[in-house]
Amino acid sequence: MVAGEASGDTLGADLILSLKKRFPNARFVGIGGQKMIANGFESWYPLEKLSVMGLFEVLKHLPSLLRLRKELIQKLLQLKPDVFIGIDAPDFNFKMEGILKENAIPTIHYVGPSVWAWREKRLLKICKQVDGVLVLFPFETAYYDKYGIPSKFVGHPLTNQVADSPDKHSARQQLGLSSDTPVTGILPGSRSSEINLMIDVYVQVATKLHEAYPQMKFVIPCVNQAAKERVALSISLYGKGIDFILLDQQAQLAMAASDQLIVTSGTATLEAALMQRPLILAIKLHPISYWIMKRLATTKWVGLPNVLAGKCIVPELIQENATVDKIAQTLDKLITDKEMREVQLTEFKKQYDALNQNASELAADAVVKWAKLKND
């Protein structure tokens, strides 16, 4: 098994436990994080070696990543495992899966790449690299069927995490907020590029909302210290006299405590929907990135709740529409329009129910079937 980041470590850890029920003496090796290791996984290299984000960062680390992949392939060809499971990290794993498959080692990829959003033609190559793909969304299987790739929808792990998150009352207690205080959560993203493009806009939006709702407080989870400092700088410039609560990570706590959210796109939009919090999506990209995305994108929407609904239930303010005035007006409408909130919440409940599957058990069943595993 090779997991590429923290989310993959969680998926891998759960899958190991489910496979151990079926094969108590199985050995699990490759690259994994602390959760996988805690469940008996033997990690040959630290997970952090693969946790590289952003084009520049990947290019900087490319020689060492290619060297690592070459070493891994050699080790695995020597070992000849009964099955190889690549967890996410598509740019790293698919090439490796293809070589292992050519050498008669069954290969399975867990978390299908977002071919439904862009570059669907990747599946022409992927069909030669894997014996099956485990996907997180029900609509994804149709894409794999089209290219003759076995796939199985196993549900989304966020449903389990959300089930363990605090309710609004306990979240507010933790933050020292009363139950009748109006609270808006602001999620500016996890990458520095997202934060730099959006945080000044968001703080100015908060200033406008504060004029209309003087009692309103704003909760902002910050992914790391650098993000926290950038947010604090923005507040000192545009948000003086307004009550902001900055958290160290704790995005789910921020969501749980909030009445509504402003979210930069990504997994956070789905997380907010699964936590049943009304939201709007706002995002600005670098002009070149936006141009490329517009040319390659095959979906009408950016936010996962809209993709899952097949219609626009969450307002999306993108690029030139992501202005202070437009975001503030849209959020004000979300606060005051009960029907708009109800439409979102009804759809979010359906999405939670659809994605709330026993993912690791379903994944283990598919692995056994596709890799033709037997208890000797």
Curated annotation (Swiss-Prot):
Pathway assigned in UniProt: Bacterial outer membrane biogenesis; LPS lipid A biosynthesis
InterPro entries: Glyco_trans_19 (IPR003835)
Catalytic activity: a lipid X + a UDP-2-N,3-O-bis[(3R)-3-hydroxyacyl]-alpha-D-glucosamine = a lipid A disaccharide + UDP + H(+)
Annotated keywords: Glycosyltransferase, Lipid A biosynthesis, Lipid biosynthesis, Lipid metabolism, Transferase
GO molecular function: lipid-A-disaccharide synthase activity; phospholipid binding
GO term, biological process aspect, one: lipid A biosynthetic process
Keyword flag Lipid metabolism: yes
The keyword Coiled coil is assigned to this record: no
E.C. number(s) listed in UniProt: 2.4.1.182
Leading EC class: transferase
Superkingdom in the source lineage: Bacteria
GO cellular component: membrane
Family named by the database record: Belongs to the LpxB family.
Function: Condensation of UDP-2,3-diacylglucosamine and 2,3-diacylglucosamine-1-phosphate to form lipid A disaccharide, a precursor of lipid A, a phosphorylated glycolipid that anchors the lipopolysaccharide to the outer membrane of the cell.
UniProt cross-references to NCBIfam families, sorted A to Z: lpxB
Protein name: Lipid-A-disaccharide synthase
Organism of provenance: Hydrogenovibrio crunogenus (strain DSM 25203 / XCL-2)
Gene: lpxB
